[in-house]
Amino acid sequence: MANKREFPLDRTRNIGIMAHIDAGKTTTTERILYYTGKIHKIGETHEGASQMDWMPQEQERGITITSAATTAFWKDHRVNIIDTPGHVDFTIEVERSLRVLDGAITVLDAQSGVEPQTENVWRQATTYGVPRLVFVNKMDKIGADFDYSMTTLHDRLQANAHAVQMPIGAEDKFEGVIDLIEMKADLYDEDELGTKWDTVDVPDDYKEAAQKAHNDLIEAVADVDDGIMDKYLEGEEISNAELKAAIRKATINLEFYPVLAGSAFKNKGVQMLLDAVIDYLPSPLDVRPYHATDPDTGDAVELTAGDDKPFAALAFKVATDPFVGRLTYIRVYSGTLEAGSYVLNATKDNRERVGRLLQMHSNHREEIPEVFSGDIAAAIGLKNTTTGDSLTDVDHPLILESLDVPDPVIQVSIEPDSKEDQDKLDVGLQKLSEEDPTFKAETNPETGETLIAGMGELHLDIMVDRLKREFKVAAKVGEPQVAYRETFTKETSAQGKFVRQSGGKGQYGDVWIEFTPNEEGKGFEFENAIVGGVVPREYIPAVEQGLKEAMANGVLAGYPLIDVKAKLYDGSYHEVDSSEAAFKVAASMALKNASKSAGAVILEPIMHVEVVAPEEYLGDVMGQITARRGRVEGMEARGNAQLVNSMVPLAEMFGYATTLRSATQGRGTFTMTFDHYEAVPKSIQAEIIKKNGGGVATKD
């Protein structure tokens, strides 16, 4: 018998909470869970006892690493919340959660307003078309300034953001909020942990400011809604319901961002934030259709939510749970799925059985018999499904848009303390790289070293920490290494001829290949331009494969060769002695020969580095950036501090956190994201080649 859906789709919300590190995101989530009746005792992040931060590393560091998905209930609505990390090393977690959300709350610190990482996640949310509310948190903090935070939304994000609430007081005088639509004030009782408040008329000393803010709000909504504009111009009454409906529509269309105020820590304003989630953020029925592709025909398909449609879901996270093993978090876009049934992994084209289905509450779980359209849940039993895979009805395969996964930019060598731990290390690394596609582990074929690669030093620290805790592997980690690449800068042609015809079965392969530089980010492109069968068709894939394998080991210092086009245009073969293996070797020889005249260069990752520091340290900060081969691209004032935008090679950024701390007496902060690859200066290229043994010897 089919199970009954508990909440209709229009009363479902899938939301994320996103912010700069330390803006109070986890505390806000905590309070939402507390007021929706999910927790009985509030955990404070800075005491290491938060509900959402469930990995031991997160509780120790007071930061959120993995986006735990939690279900809460408010006013007859189901709200699925995904907690996202605010640290830039974990952008894949943010991308992942934004891909499966319908709406988001952006949390700002009332003292700092929009911070660098807020800008990053805001940009990502815009890319994925996610409607947002803004919660100006920490209104009780010294230096809290609601108007300043509003200004930063306009200046730094160019967001059409407008207050739907106004704070009453600030810092230790913060008492509550004024609802600028209903024109009522909500004053909190200090002793009741925010569970009780009085709704009263707007206090006299706020009446004038509140009325002006109310009028500004109506004007702002009129700018994005023709119906409100007509009434406004005619001087007609606009009802609260009409105003809310117009705000909802404009918010869902990404034309308007409602702003609310509060203090999660002091338990003020969280219930009104929940009301705004219900009032203004979309249900799965309100969002634009999801794009999918039919793998059989290649046709684009639009998916809309509905239980009566074939099942389609995206696996957006894989996690290893200490009690139930491998959990696959899924977002259901259409249809329903019962525990125990089969699904098709359309990405890998294989069938898998879903053993059990769980609804997650941070790290508690509740078994459920079935999931419905719009749900977020965790499945047990999917052995071959990885992040970004599409799971569909067996008879209706679809590929949903997958995630953009950035390549790792930093690597370190890792070796277990004892030989016995090697197997455990291998298992641990395999599991961690399944969970996190930006974390890669590989063995260097020449040295036998195990290398791990990721998005930053903190990312790798946490992975090594997890190996120790979850897989009981004690390991030594080497110095961080930069993930260099190589490329060609000139067009050239070369022959590769491999002949071995003395005794036994001979070998013969002969190719002429033209190499040209490709556009940045386009990768390797191979073209077969053979005419008249001078290289038989069955050997063409071997030529391409031989090039790929040789490119993986580079031509200068052993780093992968990228962004090159190769055109096979001539060659010869031997009726008896030619083989795939011979053409593979010939192709690698052509690459090696071409490298002498192709202007081969080593590329290094260039990071976009944003430093925020008080004005008085500006000279030191800029001096340090220049000393690290960096380019300052621009500066802007951030309150009484300065933000310095720069491009700096990753190789020069190791240990920068310590340098910045001491230069600014602990008051400077920075964020760093990968931007592009660039050729290293000649002198540094020579050093790298020398250090790596002067180029790679290809095996004959």
From Swiss-Prot:
Its main location: cytoplasm. GO terms for molecular function: GTP binding; GTPase activity; translation elongation factor activity. Keywords: Cytoplasm, Elongation factor, GTP-binding, Nucleotide-binding, Protein biosynthesis. One of its GO terms (biological process) is ribosome disassembly. Belongs to the TRAFAC class translation factor GTPase superfamily. Classic translation factor GTPase family. EF-G/EF-2 subfamily. The keyword NADP does not apply. Catalyzes the GTP-dependent ribosomal translocation step during translation elongation. During this step, the ribosome changes from the pre-translocational (PRE) to the post-translocational (POST) state as the newly formed A-site-bound peptidyl-tRNA and P-site-bound deacylated tRNA move to the P and E sites, respectively. Catalyzes the coordinated movement of the two tRNA molecules, the mRNA and conformational changes in the ribosome. GTP binds at residues 19-26, 83-87, 137-140. It is found in: Cytoplasm. The gene is fusA. The keyword Nucleotide-binding applies. Transmembrane segments: none annotated. This is Elongation factor G. It comes from the Bacteria.
